[in-house]
Amino acid sequence: MEQLVYIALLGALGCLCRYFLSGFVYQVFGTSFPYGTLAVNLIGAFLIGLIMEFSVRSAAIPPTLRFAITIGFLGGLTTFSTFSFETFRLLEDGALLIAIVNVLVSVVACLTCTWIGIMVARAL
């Protein structure tokens, strides 16, 4: 039960971080492209690569903390559902090219950020 509390608390923190970070990114770059969602997903992809690889190679992150961070915080920070909704809206609005770019950039860049996180963890 204690682990569920940690997951919930860090999940709430991740949600708040997503709200403020994506809002800031949209203020800076505008809303013509889902920049805010892309930003939080890129950060989350990097962090999950870093944390998971580091925890596999080291006992420095106990499983309870790893689950709280990855399932809770990163689960709250990142958002596949918003990515899906924003892409669907782009398609509905006739912005086919922007929707395709969003899908391709999101998938390729998130995989790349995960890989970079793994490489950083291996270098530590």
Swiss-Prot record:
A GO MF label: fluoride channel activity
Signal peptide annotation: none
Reaction(s) this enzyme catalyzes, per UniProt: fluoride(in) = fluoride(out)
Pfam families, sorted: CRCB (PF02537)
Regulation: Na(+) is not transported, but it plays an essential structural role and its presence is essential for fluoride channel function.
Keyword match Ion transport: yes
Listed GO CC annotations: plasma membrane
Membrane-spanning intervals of the chain: 5-25, 32-52, 67-87, 96-116
Binding site for Na(+): 75, 78
Membrane topology: Multi-pass membrane protein
Compartment annotation: Cell inner membrane
One GO BP: cellular detoxification of fluoride
Keywords of the record: Cell inner membrane, Cell membrane, Ion channel, Ion transport, Membrane, Metal-binding, Sodium, Transmembrane, Transmembrane helix, Transport
Family the UniProt entry places it in: Belongs to the fluoride channel Fluc/FEX (TC 1.A.43) family.
Function: Fluoride-specific ion channel. Important for reducing fluoride concentration in the cell, thus reducing its toxicity.
Protein name: Fluoride-specific ion channel FluC
Species name: Citrifermentans bemidjiense (strain ATCC BAA-1014 / DSM 16622 / JCM 12645 / Bem)
Upper classification of the organism: Bacteria, Pseudomonadati, Thermodesulfobacteriota, Desulfuromonadia, Geobacterales
